[in-house]
Amino acid sequence: MVWRNGRRAELVTNAAQYARGYDPATGKELWRLAKKSEVTIPMPVVGPDLVYITSGNRPIQPIFAVRPGVTGDISLQASEEHNAHIAWSKMRGGPYMTTPIAYGEYLYVCSNAGILTCYAADTGKEVYKERLGGVSYTASPLAADGRLYFTSEQGEVRVVKAGPQFELLAVNELGDVCMATPAISGRTLFVRSQHFLFALGRKQPAE
């Protein structure tokens, strides 16, 4: 993922043991962050001022908020929760499969079991933690027009209002297994299930 921040462009990778930032023009390593996590699936996530690195492999399930323009080994020491390079961190709560969403002033993290945690994006303060419903989540969520979309493996698309208070707006039942991350084009949400491709949106009036 290329992060174009106010200082430079950084190619950010999230891998086992380390996350790294590279100069995309030369491939030179700019920084590295020890995560102490053997398995990493989620992508890095860009917010307004920080990039978020997560992993949900037990026993360590970290979330790191990395500042732009850092250089060298930016790893936290054993007793640290932040340093000059990392704005904040959590050693529990990182997702195993799903990539979080940085949307507006908040970072939203959904666990495999459907526990949605909302953090203040700049400080890491927990704003709320709520159960979405559904059994399991593999697909990463999406955000658009002030709404968050979470697709369970059981084929239920849950729509949550973005913001500091949890509000479930709708549940759309598709009736088929869903594991792929949906995509948004225009005002249509496309969801690929095991047997079908769904296009969800408002029906346009006939001309």
Where are these regions (language model features)?
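Noncatalytic, solvent-exposed loop/strand surfaces
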Residues: 1-207
